[in-house]
Amino acid sequence: MENNDELMPREKLLAFGAKALSDYELLAIFLRTGIKDCPVMSLSKNVLTHFGSLHALLSADKKAFCSVKGLGITQFIQLQAITEMTKRYLKQEMLSTPIINDLETVKLFLLTELQHEEREVFMVLFLDNQHRLIKKERLFLGTINVSAVYPREIIKEALYCNAAALILAHNHPSGITEPSYSDQLITKKIQDAAELMEIRVLDHLIVGKSDCYSFAENCLL
């Protein structure tokens, strides 16, 4: 039974692609084997039930991760390595492709960067005149409101790296991506300051636990 349970997700992936698999099936492939009296598929479901979600599992620190029966330091190290490789892959994709042509890659990148943060983080992507990434910068931490975000600091950094365009981003630790009035006001202030220097604000993305809200897609820019 163990072998059948282990092979089923792999066969499904080969036949239909990784997107066809559930969270626990993907985790089962990662875990590879179960433990005594607990086949890998059951172990995978137990692990996800314990953490509550794939997001919580990936966010767990070493102590919390290794405290779960069937998980250990080896799996923790492997999962951290996979997560970091994903971040680097997405960054390299953004460096080689005009960002404006691939908003989904930007969203995935920002999710890997910000979805696990317990505090609000305001990040800016600085782009060249072909909308390729020059650099990313975390500029403000804590409660993100009009008094905590300084447009002049953003414009100063943009001029320093000769950026022609910006993508703004910040996370909502609550997971709710709907923009507040304060979010809209901050965006307008930055946009006005950028226009004075002939720098475009292409989008402002609010990052939740599993998705992003785009100001541009919702006609708020």
UniProtKB/Swiss-Prot annotation:
Zn(2+) binds at residues 170, 172, 183. The keyword tRNA processing does not apply. Pfam families: RadC (PF04002), UPF0758_N (PF20582). Residues 98-221 form the MPN domain. InterPro entries: MPN (IPR037518), RadC_JAB (IPR025657), RuvA_2-like (IPR010994), UPF0758 (IPR001405), UPF0758_CS (IPR020891), UPF0758_N (IPR046778). Keywords: Hydrolase, Metal-binding, Metalloprotease, Protease, Zinc. PROSITE patterns: MPN (PS50249), UPF0758 (PS01302). GO terms for molecular function: metal ion binding; metallopeptidase activity. A motif (JAMM motif) lies at residues 170-183. Belongs to the UPF0758 family. PANTHER family: DNA REPAIR PROTEIN RADC (PTHR30471), UPF0758 PROTEIN YEES-RELATED (PTHR30471:SF3). This is UPF0758 protein NTHI1125. It comes from Haemophilus influenzae (strain 86-028NP).
